[in-house]
Amino acid sequence: MSEFHFKRLEKYKVGGTRDKMELKVPLPHSPSGKVYRWCPNVDCTPRLFLLGDAQIPEKLDISQLKRTPGTQGTTCPYCGMDADDDEFNYLGDIKAIQKYIEWAASRDVNDYFVKMAKDFNRSQPRGGLISIKMDIKPDYSQEPRAWREDLIRNLACNICGRKYGVYAIALFCPDCGGKNLHVHFEREIELILQQIDLAEQVAETNNSELSYRILGNAHEDVVTVFETYQKVFYRYMIKKIFPKDQSEKMIDKGAIGNRFQNLDRAKDLYKKLSLDPFSVLTLEELDLMKLNIEKRHVIGHNLSLADESYADTMSRGKPGTTVEILAEEISEFAETVKKIIMELEQLM
């Protein structure tokens, strides 16, 4: 079999000999061209993220880098763990590559013997008393293909330009390791502004009730984002600073609850970290935050009808009437929250 070649595998050969090849088989990729990565930290949640192409900008701010883009090493965007690239291999990808190699080798061997049989049969004399025929059943099995799905949140690091995908929110760029919390928040603002634009378009069709509901959803999203980003930051910092047995108690559902929907209760939690991210706000901005958080409660839990508590506390509206939701106020609210998110990122 000196003329035999593993034709399907040789195209992935990067070293070794013909009989003992070193292969580099590409990882399965998603429709957008990203590959699965899996955080090696067993305590990380949700662990799975996707890594795309590198697009290093012309002007690279090296002061923001943890690691030179494109070099050895990966950072988990969720928990911040740093490890070699191979440590982030997705087990399903390894199995998919093994399955492909087995299929390719089997097909190459089968193709060789099918050709050998054809050559042998053609070489046999015709018309004799005895005829010999070699019969090899061809292998028509399909090439195994692994399906990889893109996650909902796909963006690029604002520092090194690396594209990646996560579940809704992350803290770091997996390539350069730079802080990326504000990059995700910018995407949240984009989505909120799109809702505001949609509400204005609907209003032009004289469907004021639907327009009002869409604005209400946009307003609620700002508060939801405000709460969620604080939770993610807080859990990361607690795990970073405190021992595991202590941190697990400090970040469980009962210990956090909905405290990040209330500025005073959130401040009490931040005292455990000796931090006050709200210090970047003016008194007027703090009042704006409190107003909008109270308004969100009315929008989300009372069909936007002001109750006595809201009317008395905020000195706005009459009980039983709908609260006012304005596009410019939502935008101002989002920009105020952004100041807090930027401060959280600096404190990481």
Language model features with spans:
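Cysteine-rich micro-motifs
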Residues: 65-82, 169-180
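Amphipathic, Lys/Arg-enriched alpha-helical patches that create a basic surface
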Residues: 293-298, 312-348
